[in-house]
Design a protein with these regions (language model features):
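Inter-helical turn/loop segments and adjacent helix faces that build the functional surface
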Residues: 47, 51, 79-87, 175
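Active-site-proximal catalytic alpha-helix in oxidoreductases
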Residues: 57-84, 88-102
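NAD(P)-dependent Rossmann-like dehydrogenase/reductase catalytic/cofactor-binding core
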Residues: 94-212
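Rossmann-fold dinucleotide-binding core
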Residues: 1-75
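Short, basic, helix/turn surface patches
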Residues: 26-31, 77-86, 206-211
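Short, histidine-centered active-site or binding-site loop motifs used for metal coordination
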Residues: 21, 79, 152
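Short, structured loop/turn "capping" segments at alpha-beta junctions
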Residues: 49-52, 75, 82, 107-113
Length: 212
């Protein structure tokens, strides 16, 4: 199942829905069966947006790529809206994604991104110059942060970045593709979690310097 639902624990017992509303369910690595169809029907009856995905492995890889920016937003203390608006932050995230695109090409792994753009097209879009205004007013109730940011902010002591950026690093090592930025994001975010360092210890420049 690929989960495309954003949520934030704003305080104990309160979960805020911060974006996305889709579950994609399929058999691994492709196809579907009675269980998949039955689960999707149950989800639809509960007013959840869900669908059967015949190529769920490709969708899971696409979700992993989306999650590569989580460590960056956590270390720099940026919301999704803030990072998406600033060309400096978009450029960093584009470079992180380009490392991943090179690795996936070398490994001959097919992926499917959310939306109509391919991964390479999304990277080109991130590199477009200028500030991007946020769609609508960004307030405390609409501002969204990834799960990794929440892990650091709540001092949970662990993060998932080794499953995200770490996967790209290990694939890069296997196929001889450099992944300097993904490596530094993984390593520094793991250190921040272990040391209970709150979000905001890094910026784009310090991360690039650490990757040299």
């Amino acid at each position: 199942c690929t989960v495309m639902v954003g949520a934030e624990i704003s305080r104990p017992g309160i979960v805020r829905h911060s974006g996305g509303y889709l579950l994609e369910v399929g058999a691994w690595p492709q196809g579907s069966d009675y269980v998949c169809n039955s689960l999707v029907n149950d989800l639809l009856r509960s007013e959840m947006n869900a669908r059967v995905d015949e190529r769920v492995a490709e969708g899971k890889w696409g979700k992993l790529i989306r999650n590569l920016a989580n460590a960056y937003l956590a270390l720099t203390d940026l919301s999704v809206q803030e990072a998406s608006s600033d060309p400096v932050d978009r450029s960093f995230m584009a470079d992180v994604n380009e490392e991943a695109a090179d690795v996936l090409d070398a490994a001959k792994i097919s992926i499917r991104m959310v939306g109509k753009r391919t991964l390479r097209e999304q990277i080109a879009r991130l590199r477009e110059p200028g500030w991007w205004p946020s769609p609508g007013e960004v307030t405390d109730s609409t501002r969204s942060y990834p799960s990794t940011w929440q892990d650091l902010a709540l001092e949970r002591g662990k993060v998932e970045v080794d499953h995200f950026n770490g996967t790209i690093v290990r694939l890069g090592e296997r196929h001889g593709v450099p992944t300097l930025l993904n490596r530094v994001l993984r390593d520094l975010c793991l250190d921040a979690a272990a040391n209970l360092t709150p979000p905001g210890s890094e910026n784009a420049d310090s991360l690039r310097a650490a990757a040299l």
